[in-house]
Design a protein with these regions (language model features):
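Generic recognition of well-ordered alpha-helical segments
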Residues: 10, 14, 33-37, 58, ...
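N-terminal DNA-binding module of tyrosine recombinases/phage integrases
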Residues: 1-50, 54-57
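N-terminal DNA-binding recognition helix of tyrosine site-specific recombinases/integrases
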Residues: 34, 38, 46-58, 66-103, ...
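Basic, Lys/Arg- and aromatic-enriched nucleic-acid-binding interface segment
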Residues: 74, 78, 93-150, 154-156, ...
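Helix-turn-helix-type domain boundary/helix-start signal
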Residues: 21, 46-49, 70, 115, ...
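Conserved tyrosine-mediated DNA breakage-rejoining catalytic core shared by Y-recombinases
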Residues: 119, 156-211
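Hydrophobic (often cysteine-bearing) scaffold residues that line and stabilize catalytic clefts
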Residues: 4, 8, 24-27, 31, ...
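Conserved hydrophobic/aromatic pocket- or pore-lining residues that grip, position, or stack substrates
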Residues: 39, 56, 84, 125, ...
Length: 211
């Protein structure tokens, strides 16, 4: 039923609650952060009936502005626009608006050069790791030769390491998430993988076993 006095942020709160029930905690925290930081302040005094295409385009342009004190990356901007589009779709599905408004999320692609170790740098790192044996060094070695993400490495337990069959069972990840309270502090969260493919068996090189 259409509510003529509903504000955009009222629907934003409803949308966030739906995401809280349907998404992984890490995904919800990310959405909540983007909503609180970028979406809610802009639409604070805007009624849904006033959220027309020119207003939405102005919002999009504000995200793209190079004059911003802290310019956003294209990935962040694209995610914000997708969230706004999802909220606009909910507005239509619940009968608050008569049509679906849409903000194009496609942006010019930036291809930053990804720094990688040179062969000499990798040899220097391995020489150091071999000379300084410890938990931290072993974890770096694992990351270097298994390709595990930092969160996956930190979440490894002894029962995930199968020495006789020489493989690792990646079952969890650790993430540092912002707490959803007034302190805005962060906490470490152990969770399962986001996708089936992330729950996987990774070969363990034989030369790493003595480490």
């Amino acid at each position: 039923m259409k509510n003529e006095t509903m504000y955009f942020n009222d629907l934003l709160s409803i949308w966030l609650e739906k995401q809280k029930q349907a998404r992984a905690l890490s995904t919800y925290v990310k959405y909540r952060h983007l909503a609180d930081r970028y979406i809610s302040p802009y639409f604070r005094s805007i009624q849904l009936s006033k959220a027309d295409l020119p207003l939405l385009q102005t919002f999009r342009n504000s995200l793209l502005s190079p004059d911003s004190l802290h310019p956003l990356g294209n990935g962040t901007i694209r995610c914000i626009l997708l969230l706004v589009n999802s909220i606009l779709r909910l507005s239509y599905e619940t009968g608050q608006t008569n049509g679906i408004l849409y903000l194009p999320p496609r942006l010019p692609k930036k291809r930053p050069e990804v720094p990688v170790f040179t062969l000499q740098e990798q040899e220097q790192l391995e020489h150091y790791l071999t000379a300084h044996t410890g938990v931290s060094e072993a974890v770096i070695y694992l990351g270097l030769y298994t390709g595990l993400r930092v969160g996956e490495l930190c979440a490894l337990r002894w029962e995930n390491i199968h020495f006789s069959d020489r493989y690792l069972h990646v079952r969890h990840t650790v993430q540092r998430l912002t707490r959803l309270d007034t302190t805005h502090k962060s906490e470490l969260i152990l969770s399962g993988p986001k996708s089936i493919s992330s729950n996987r068996l990774v070969p363990l090189p034989a030369f790493l076993l003595p480490i």
